[in-house]
Amino acid sequence: MAKEKISEQELITRIRGEITGALGYMGDTISQQREQAMQYYYGLPFGNEVEGRSQYVDTTVQDTIEWIKPSLMRVFASGDEMVKFTPHGPEDVQMAEQATDYVNYVFTKDNPGWEILYSWFTDALLSKNGIVKVWWDEYENEEREEYRNLDENGLMVLISDDEVEVVEHTQHQQEGEPPYHDIVIKRKSYDGRIKIENVPPSEFLIARESKNIQEARFVCHRVLKTLSELKEMYPDEDLDPAELGGGDEDLMAFSGERLERYAYDKSAQYWEGWGDTDVEEEGLRTYWLHESFLKTDWDGDGITELRKVCTVGSKVLSNEEIDKIPFVSLTPVKIPHKFYGLSVADLVMDLQLIKSTLMRNLMDNMYNQNFGRYAVLEGQANLDDLLTQRPGGVVRVKSPNAVTPLATPALEPYTFQMLEYIDSVRESRAGVSRMSQGLNENALTSHTTATAVNAVMGAAQSRVELIARNFAETGVKDLMICIYELLYKNQDRERVVKLRNQWIPVRPDVWKDKYDCSVSVALGSGNKDQQMAHLSQMLSFAGDAMKGGLPIVNIQNMYNLGAALVRAMGFQNVDDFLTNPATIPPKQEGPSPKEQMEQAELQLKEKELEIKAADVQVKMQKIQQEYQKDAVDAQLKAAELNLESQQNRPVAIG
C-alpha cells in the first residue's frame, strides 16, 4: 500500500520537534558551555566575589586563543594559494591549474576571505566548532539606459528584448519625415556568485546523534530577519504580520549564549523575546527565520530525500529538494564519532579559575601584610587612633605591650611557583609557551644554540600545528571542495578574471568532476625566514648541479626555485622579476654540419647546371647567328643572279 504524502502541518510538527531536541537549543549543555567560555574569554567576574576582597580575574582563555590565532592565520592566509587541485593525469593539468586559481580567487576576491577565516577560527577555538555557510547566490541587476532619435526599426529591436522595461517614451515627428523616438528603459540582467558567511554558534542547530553535517538527519540555521527582508526574499508569499506572530511561540529566541557575546560592553538587549514589538515601522519588525535541512519522505515513496524548508513561526515560506547541506564545520580538538569537539577554551578554563584564585589570595595576603590585624589589650590603647590609618599617625597607649601586630605569613614565593606550574600545564594542553609568546627573557643566552631554540619552539608548537592540520583536513578542504562543486554546477557563463597576472576567460561548467583532482591545503612548516634560507640553499645546489653538468636540474627547475624564493620574500608578481622559460618561444636552430655540407654540394651542383645552361644558350645563339648570316648570303646571291640575268653581265652586291 502506497504511503500518503506528508502534510504541511505534519512537516511543521516534525521540524519543531527536531529543533527542541537539537544540540545548541535554548540553554542545553553545549550552549551553557559556550556561554561560560565567552564569559571566561572576556574576563568577566565568576560570581563568587566577596565585597572588600580582591576580585582579580585572569585572562588565560583570551591570552591562549589570541596567541594561537596568529600562527593559524600565517599558515592559511600568508600564501597566494589557499588550496591546490592536483591533476591525476597530463590531460587534467590545465584544468587543475585554472580550478586552483579561480577557486582561490572566489574565496579571497569575491568574498572577504581573511575575515571569514579569522571569525571561523575564533569560533572554533572559543566555541568548540566554527561554522560557515556557502551557497550559490543568484541576483538581479537593473540598469537605466537612455536612447534618443531612434527610428522605428531601432525602437522595435530595443523593446523586443524580454529583459527590457520601458520607463519613458516620447515620439517626435516633423511634416514629411518619418517619426523618431526618445526612450528611457530599464534593462534587467541575472547573474550569480558564491557567497560565504560565518554562522554564529548560537544560530546553528544539529541533531544530537550526528557525527558530521552531511550525514545529519536534521540541521537548522535560525537567523533574525526584518519583515522587509523577508518580503524581499519571498516576494510571492503573502506575509501578514498577524499570521507570523513573533516568529517564535516557544521562547527559542532567547539565548543566553548569544547575549553573552555582548555582555562585555552591554551592546545588545538583555532580553530578546518575540521580535521587536516596540518598533513603530512594520517593515522593521524582526522575526526568526528557520532554514531547516532535514531528511524526510515528503513524496511518500518510502525513501527519504534531503529538503530545505524555511519557516517563520507556523508559516512555511519554501520547501524544496536539495543535494547538499550548505554548511562546513571545523573543530580544534576532534572527538571521534561526535560532531562537537573540544575548544581551546575547554582545555584551559579551569586554569583561568585557578590562577584567578591564586592571584586573589596573593593580593589579599599583600593587603593584610600592609594593613594587618592587631591584638589590643582592652582599655590599654585608644582604638580611634589605632583605626585611623595615616602616615606619621600616633597611637596612644597606656602600656608598652598594649598593641601587638598579628603575623601574616607571606604567600609570594609559593604562589609564584604555583603560577609557573599552571603556565606549564597550559603549555602542555594548548601548546602556548612563554617562549613562543616572546615573554621568557631567560630563553636566549650566550650558550643557547639556534638548534636548541628551534627544538624547544617546535615542541611547543606541535600542538598548534596539530590544530592547524585538523582545520585543514576537516574544514578548509571541505569548504574549497564546496566552492568547486557550486561553480561547476551553477556558473554556466564565461567570466573573465585576472589570474596569474593575465586576463583569463573561465567556464567552470566545462571542468571535469572534482574527483579528477585531489585537494591539498597549503600547510607548511617554519616561518618565511626559514623558507627563504631553505630555498636559497636549494637554489645554490641546483646552480652547482647545472654547472657540473648533472642531468638532475634543468632551466625550468631553476625558474621554479627562483619563483618560490620571490614569493617567500613577499612579492607575488613573479613575472616582474623572472621570466618563465616555458613562455619563451624556441629559437630557430641552425643546420647541422652534415646538412651544411649537403646544402653546399647542392648549391655547387646548381651552379654547375647554371653554367651548363649558359653554355648551351651561347651555342644556340651562335647557331642562330650563323643561320641568319647564311640566309642573308643566300638572299644576296639570289639578287646578284637576278641582276645578271637582266643586264647580261656579272654584278656584285655588297
Predicted regions and their residues:
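C-terminal anchoring/interaction modules
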Residues: M1-Q55, A124, V132, D137-K188, ...
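Broad, structure-driven detector of short, well-ordered beta-strand segments within folded domains
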Residues: R285-F293
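Basic- and hydrophobic-enriched, low-structure N-terminal and domain-boundary segments
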Residues: I206-K231
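N-terminal-proximal low-complexity accessory segments that begin disordered
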Residues: M1-D137, P200, F204
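Small/polar low-complexity and glycine-rich loop motifs
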Residues: G176, P200, F204, Q214
